Amino acid sequence: MIGLIITATISVTLIMVLLVVAGTFTWVERRLLGFVQERLGPNRVGPFGSLQWIADTVKILTKEDRPPPGADKFAYILAPAVAATPVLAGFGVIEFGDGLSLAAVDVGVLFLIGMLGLTAYAVVLGAWASHSRFALMGGMRAAAQMLAYEVFLGLSLMGAVMLAGSLSMNAIVEAQRDVWFVVLQPLGAALFCIAGVAAAHRLPFDLPESENDLVAGFMTEYTGMSFGLFFLGEYLAVLLVSALAVTLFFGGWLGPWLPGPIWFGLKTGVIAVVFVWLRATLPRPRYDQLLSFAWKIALPLSLANLLLTGIVVVARSAS
């Protein structure tokens, strides 16, 4: 009973920390976008606008949340929760330090891929439930994008898994004590980051919510906290993909002088800032170009990287 209470307390604490980090990340993103676009960004609430995300949260909580006419109310309400919950669950197996995780799962990588994949179902569910043509088109785009990018997302990280010989997050990090896997797997790391951007539905792969032609895509009919949960799920997905990239390719918590969790946080922050930089600088491609890149370029490269890694691993074990 005491162990259950301790686990529940740690879980709630982790969720609260993640919510604060996600909110702070929205402020960092807006400030960086303002810098790139030569404007100020948030600068009114708190020092340098650092409390703007709290004001936005209060605003969202006080807005009316009403399903549109003709919507499937149960699915409409369920979809935002499905968008945020799997991502929060994914952080439960992330190794923030040596043995510092909520749940030490031997197949942590597989679990995380499954959790990231569930976010696409939330998009499709919300799009279908909204009873809107714009939302439905966004949901169809999300389904096609998920089929394309989830495939090579899994294939791109298999190189690191093969080098470590395990699906355990801890074992993968420990295998990088001599050299980070980004050195041994540069192509795999690049492909994983590209697929991660698509999995999080971030620019330039945010076609399911493209404002130019779909108003707000699958979120067109959402308001209030329902919209906020979709928004939260997206930013948490960015942080989760960044944390997974750090674990797989950038040595996890390993580093000199500083404690492991600090190294992990710094590395994750750098990857997340790269996501923001991509949003600020890259244009949104056409949808056919998005899918063509996935099936015709990224997937063959992922298979080639996997084959080459397999040959190297077999040759190393034979020698």
Swiss-Prot record:
Keywords: Cell inner membrane, Cell membrane, Membrane, NAD, Quinone, Translocase, Transmembrane, Transmembrane helix, Ubiquinone
EC top class named in words: translocase
Top-level lineage group: Bacteria
Cross-referenced Pfam families: NADHdh
A GO term for molecular function: NADH dehydrogenase activity
Entries under PANTHER family matching the protein: NADH DEHYDROGENASE SUBUNIT 1 (PTHR11432), NADH-UBIQUINONE OXIDOREDUCTASE CHAIN 1 (PTHR11432:SF3)
NCBIfam families in alphabetical order: PRK06076.1-1, PRK06076.1-2
Name of the protein described by the UniProt record: NADH-quinone oxidoreductase subunit H 1
Species for this entry: Rhodopseudomonas palustris (strain BisB5)
